[in-house]
Each structure stands twice: as C-alpha cells, then as structure tokens.
C-alpha cells in the first residue's frame, strides 16, 4: 500500500485534501468515503503497519502450537496490566494490545482502557455485534430531561445504516421490533436447538413482549467480492484470513486503496491539530514519528478525528491555543466530559435438561440477543433507560471433568461424549452521561514520547446501580420461565471501560454552548474538523455502538465532501 515517508521539509509534498486520524472502524470508513468522493487522503495511524492475512500470524495455530498453550506469562502481564485484568490476556492476541508501559494512563478511579495501536485498531478484535439504534435512543435524553438532546433522529441516520450494512455485510433476522430497527441483512446464522426452545418459552411466558433472537453480526453468511463467508472457526480476534468479518483490513482499507487516493502513514502520533486563527479553521496536524521521534506537519482542507473516544479527546485537548486554552472544541466546557460505557460482567446461567441427542455445527461466531424491554411500551422501572442481553447455549466438553477424581478407560470414554446443555446470558445496559465523569490531560505524567497522558475519573452512579440489580433479577427470572435448572447469577462489579464501549468526551448537540459537535459531527470551533467515533455520542443506548459509528462517519464524510465542493469549508 502507499506509505508516506516524506521528510516533512516540503509543504507541497505533505498537503492533501483530507486527513484521517486513526484507522479503526470509524477511521477506515472515513478514509473509504472521502477517497471514494475523489479526495486525496492521508490516514495517520500511531501504531505499526498491519497487513491483511500476512500479519495474522496466530490465525492458523491450534492451542497446542503455542509455547504456553494460550496462557500468558507474568512478564507479559507486567507489560499489559490492564488487559491482564480481563479476558484479553490470551497468548494468541497479546501482541495486538498496546504496550501499557510505553503508553500509560492515570486512574483517579479504576478504569479499564483496552487499546490496540496498529493499522486497523480494534476493528481486528471487536465483537462484531451490529445493531441499529432507534428513536427510543435518540429521543431518550430529551424525553427524560437528562443531559442534552441529540441533534439527529433515526430518520437522519437510517439511509446511512443501509449504506454501511450493505458494504460491511451484517447477518441477521428481520424481527419488526421498533426498539431494534431491522436492517439490510445477509441470511441469519442459526440458533441451536436449545436456544430456539428457550426463546420460544420466553416469548410465550411473557406474552410476546420479550424477544430472544440470533445476534446481528458483521460476519458474512454469504460471500461478497473479495471476502469469503464466515468459516465458523470463532477465532475472529486473531484476524480472519478469509475476510469473514468486517474490519478495516478486510473491507474499508482495500476499497480506499483501490481509488488510488489514499496514503497510509503508520507510526504517526498526531500530537495536535494546527488551528488557523484568521480562517478559524484547522490547516493540518502535527505528527510525532513514533520510531524516530521526528516531528512533521501535514496539511489538508478537512480533518477527521477518529482516534477512538478517549484518544480523539486527547488530540483535541492537546490542540490548545491562546484562543482555546482548554483545547480545540473546548468552548462549551464539555470536551473530555460525559464519558459512558455499557454494563458488563453480570447475568445468569444454568443447565437445560433434555436434548441429549442434539448438537450444533462448528463454532458459530455469534450468539443470541435479548432485545431491550425495560422502560418501554408502558413498562416503568425505578431507573432510566434499559438493557439487553447477549449469550449462547452450548454443551459442556471434556473440561467439565477437570476437578473430578476419576481415572481409567471409563473416564476417558466419558469425556469423549458431550456433556449437559448450558445457557448463559450477560447484560449490556445503558450508562447515563454525567458531566463529572471525565478525562483530563495530566501534564505531570508523560508517556514514552514525552507526551502528557490521560487521567481517568469516572464511575457508575445510582441509576446504574439500580439497573444492575434489575439486570441480574430479570436474567434469572427469564431463564426460570424457560425451564432452565441450577441457575446461578453473577455481578462482578463494573469499572468504566469494562464494556469496551467507551463513548462521550466530545458530544454532538444542538447548541455550541453545551456540546462540542453539531449535527454533522463538525467541531463548533472549527467547522472543517469532524469527530465521528465514540467521542461524538450524546447518550449510550444499550446496543453495541460500532454500527452507529460507521453510519455517523459515512454521513459526515459525504457531508464534508459536499461542503468542500460548495466551498463552504
């Protein structure tokens, strides 16, 4: 691919129509849309170059092929202590996560920030659940009188949901539910025998007010040009050589490169956006080369900030001037505030009797989804907003006998047979935006490159605590209603970041006095700067947000291209 390695001495050689900061899900979409509209674009990625297929070095390995059989060493944990708190500490993907000793952050309150600094970002590692938001979500703040109103509604984003779904490839079922709009889907994956049975029982016992459906996933169930359908390996996080799921590498990057309009520059830490006081617009960005520590400047007519919710805020805050001492976009006092996430680490599981003669095909890279029902259609709780569940049913394997005191041939024969059916569902719930949930620049602490780090100060509050109690209670009740036995519940607590859906910090709004971005994702303080990743979110809904990032980005990029053509920016 075209890589930019210019010296930085010649301005003409460093001038483009558009700059995209970041190469993850939203950055990839920005590059695809901008280059598709004919704009010469440079994508700046702070991490290493990472090529599709070639760099998926563990994707073809079996567990026994790894030195530590999939586990990680204490030395590896020291390098990545935050990742080691959760499931991300796995030998096949440890190198995909950021070196936290080189790029630390400060926790005023416990905060789990999962970062992947490489071309493609976390698009290689994401869970691929892809759900549209509805007007229940876009209108929630206004109806509840909480925070500020979204400046858009579902109708504004619906055609862009269509646009990104058709390109990305989303498998799913048509359900006709107003709180979870249907989309442009590939054929759905199949629910297994137990999932279908449990879903039918829940639907019947709750009078058709609760719906367990197959997940809507960015995994192909039919091949499309340049990509093969999902192989049901369920090892997506190692990278898919088949292009079976959507990522920057498999999808948006090849499309952008095919236009001939994209240049990619890895190892490029954008330290600040260059603001022109006379035009009141950005004129480019300053870049620190992560390998050489040399500084360069790149210039463009439009800048898209897609570094992920927290890093995008870092770039804006670090772009302070005498006009904007709090950073570019700070005029409202909301930059860095209103951090959100999703509830995680809670739910219920149990055993399903029967179905001993049933099994399932392969390792489906998807699960089931229980659609939101709380605080909708006359249902009223003692908290605001709602939640959904994700989970799956499966049969236990040989590991069920690890703690048993058995030996001999009979024992060996027993563990070759599938065990009992089990089903589990975990809650994903909405967190409200709070001004006091914030990040700030800590200039007393520096990273490997001498740059100020982020300080995290965010916690869940009373509304979230009430919701967590209800999530667990309803999970147990639904499984009981479906005849599930030996039900166990869990709530392991929640630190912001656990859901890996960090949002907020540069929210959209209708008024520049209370928001950072307008209805087109333009920074109020510099109309040629756009932010379209998680930073832009005004509320968090309970659905996975990545599909909405894609739609917002495609919408904003095409708006930017139109405005450039008109000479408005």
Protein language model regions, located:
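A conserved FAD-binding loop/helix module that cradles the flavin
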Residues: 539-557
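Short, glycine/acidic-rich hinge or "gate" loops at secondary-structure transitions
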Residues: 52-55, 171-183, 485-494, 566-569
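Aromatic-residue-lined binding/catalytic grooves and analogous aromatic/hydrophobic interfacial grooves
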Residues: 28, 243, 248, 364, ...
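N-terminal glycine-rich phosphate/pyrophosphate-binding loop and immediately adjacent elements
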Residues: 2-141, 146, 151, 155, ...
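FAD cofactor-binding and catalytic pocket of flavoenzymes
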Residues: 94-122, 126, 132, 150-154, ...
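A glycine-rich dinucleotide-binding beta-alpha-beta segment and adjacent secondary-structure elements
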Residues: 213-220, 228-236, 271-274, 278, ...
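Conserved redox-cofactor binding core of oxidoreductases
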Residues: 67-112, 117-118, 127-132, 137, ...
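Glycine-rich loop(s) and the adjacent beta-strand/alpha-helix scaffold that form part
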Residues: 36, 40-67, 259, 268, ...
